[in-house]
């Protein structure tokens, strides 16, 4: 697991772009079709994929996240905000 996230992922904008691409891969969608304000469940992210997204976040950013992240923060914007705050506390 990485101890320091890539510098490019430290801004909220870059986190949002990275998350959008990551989630688009899981739901088999074009990243431009995902609305960052729309609940991820509506975009097709199920519980199995949500846990996989959490594992990818942990591996890439080097911070632990709860497997309920996508339900506690149900949009790309909300997750990016949460992660940005968590990274700032490191």
Locations of regions flagged by a protein language model:
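Flexible, low-complexity inter-domain linkers and amphipathic docking helices that mediate domain-domain
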Residues: 1-90
């Amino acid at each position: 697991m990485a101890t320091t996230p890539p510098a490019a992922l430290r801004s909220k904008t870059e986190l949002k772009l990275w998350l959008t691409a990551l989630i688009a891969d899981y739901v088999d969608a074009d990243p431009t079709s995902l609305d960052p304000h729309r609940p991820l469940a509506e975009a097709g992210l199920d519980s199995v994929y949500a846990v996989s997204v959490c594992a990818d976040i942990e591996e890439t950013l080097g911070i632990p996240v709860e497997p309920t992240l996508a339900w506690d923060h149900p949009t790309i914007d909300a997750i990016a905000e949460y992660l940005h705050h968590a990274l700032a506390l490191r």
